[in-house]
Amino acid sequence: MQNVFIIGSKGIPASYGGYETFVDKLTEYHQTNDKIKYHVACAVDDNKEVGEFIYHNAQCFKIKRKKIGPAQAIVYDIDALKYTVNYIKKNNIDKAIVYILACRIGPFFKRYVKQIHSLGGKVYVNPDGHEWKRAKWSAPVKMYWKLSERLMVKHSDLLICDSKNI
């Protein structure tokens, strides 16, 4: 059985946007496929309980989203990645695929890729366009996004793009 860990969406069931709808539909369409087991990181507020639940036959694990402003998505992705690495180790999962949606954690990424590789896994990334080009970000934030994207593209095993423009 192929274990696929999905990090970077707010979670399922979908109630936010594109990535969440993608993950919701992916797990729905494959819920009876006994050759794939999905594990999905789901964000919960800091005051909520963590734990696991099953949705569309996917194992969903709750990761607390810290209230630290704009950086909360970065910390959430790192916390989900830590959880995933520990879960793979604890359960002796061989050849896991860790699929990361968006390029938020580039400066921290290589360390986790090495850990996943040492456990026999692969890391796939969906870059989600060029976040660093968006007008809403200040110059320092744009620099971070550009660096982050470059590092994640460099260290991933496979890029999965859903747009020709990417």
What are these regions (language model features)?
Residues 1-5:
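Extreme N-terminal starter segment of soluble prokaryotic enzymes
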Residues 9-15, 29-71, 165-166:
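N-terminal strand-loop element at the rim of the active site
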Residues 18-26, 76, 144:
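Conserved alpha-helical elements of sugar-nucleotide-dependent glycosyltransferases
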Residues 33-39, 93-94, 120-121:
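A generic structural motif
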Residues 56-82, 134-141:
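A short, charged, and often flexible helix/loop element on the N-terminal side
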Residues 74-85, 95-128:
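An aromatic- and histidine-rich active-site surface loop
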Residues 141-161:
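Membrane-proximal helix-turn-helix segments that form the acceptor-binding/catalytic region
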